[in-house]
Amino acid sequence: MATFLCLPSLWAQGNQYLMAEAPQKLVAKRGTSVEAKIAVSIEPNFHVNSNTPSDAYLIPLKLTWTAGGALEPGEVVFPKARMEKYEFSDKPLSVYSGDFDLVAKFKVPAGAPQGPGIMVGKLRYQACNNNSCFPPKTAEVRLSYSVQ
């Protein structure tokens, strides 16, 4: 299984509580599977609900990819969340804070066209501080790739 070539990429745009950084370029071979590590950074004193929030009314962290391009999106692997108690909730919540990584998996079909491309992802999240939660936001993640 191929992995990613790391370092700078495009950060999520806008006045956000979260930034997401994809590898600089993913190199993929036809007929294989590849993984891209997406580095996520949450502003200090904030957290986001995990991909499996504690209550149904909370909005989960979710990464989706726009259809198109040579790569076929697969599973997204999330880190283990922490259970934290906050003033605005009667029970602990499943959250992420600080810096962590998501791993996005892709299949590269045997007939995929060779050459460069860009996958566009949307990372939806609900940010909270110690007192309250805010309306959900979406950060764009752009993943450059090259099929060989």
Place the predicted regions along the sequence by residue.
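Bacterial N-terminal signal peptides
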Residues: 1-9
